[in-house]
């Protein structure tokens, strides 16, 4: 799904509003995913998945850092996320559906924290962006 110039502007503006809260929102999105979609916990058997866990916060920071990198490389997501794609496809072997579940959880998290900025247009742009990130992360599964 191609991001239009308007989509790119919406994604950059929304992620700019996330700012210093990126790691916090990443962790909250993971917690939300684990609660809403319990089967996703199977990929984290060694984690303490309780609320506020340092491990969930740490992984949330990694998710946020990857998304921040992606926002900075909207015209070259495959290049920016190549190593992460290799990791998830070849080492971690994460079922691709889980990226959609995390994307949904992240959208809900962003909507709850940025209600005035989360317009239908921004929602659509972020959804397209996250779908593109998911596509890139699963591209090496084939």
Curated annotation (Swiss-Prot):
Record PTM N6-succinyllysine, positions in chain: 8, 12, 17, 41
Residues that bear N6-acetyllysine: 17
Positions bearing Phosphoserine: 4, 36, 50, 103, 125, 139
Any one of the GO BP annotations: hydrogen peroxide catabolic process
Domain of life of the organism encoding this protein: Eukaryota
The keyword Lipid metabolism belongs to this UniProt entry's keyword annotation: no
GO CC list: blood microparticle; haptoglobin-hemoglobin complex; hemoglobin complex
Positions bound to O2: 59
Record: residues binding heme b: 88
Alphabetized UniProt keyword annotations: Acetylation, Heme, Iron, Metal-binding, Oxygen transport, Phosphoprotein, Transport
Family: Belongs to the globin family.
Subunit structure comment from the entry: Heterotetramer of two alpha chains and two beta chains.
Job description of the protein: Involved in oxygen transport from the lung to the various peripheral tissues.
Name listed for the protein in its UniProt record: Hemoglobin subunit alpha
Gene: HBA
């Amino acid at each position: 799904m191609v991001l239009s110039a308007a989509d790119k502007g919406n994604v950059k503006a929304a992620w700019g509003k996330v700012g210093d809260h990126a790691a916090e929102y990443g962790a909250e999105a993971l917690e939300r995913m684990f609660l809403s979609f319990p089967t996703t916990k199977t990929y984290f058997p060694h984690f303490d998945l309780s609320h506020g866990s340092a491990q969930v916060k740490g992984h949330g920071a990694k998710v946020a850092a990857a998304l921040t990198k992606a926002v900075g490389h909207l015209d070259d997501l495959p290049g920016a996320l190549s190593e992460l794609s290799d990791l998830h496809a070849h080492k971690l072997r994460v079922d691709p559906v889980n990226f959609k579940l995390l994307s949904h959880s992240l959208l809900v998290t962003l909507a709850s924290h940025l209600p005035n900025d989360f317009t239908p247009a921004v929602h659509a742009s972020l959804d397209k962006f996250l779908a593109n990130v998911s596509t890139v992360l699963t591209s090496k599964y084939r």
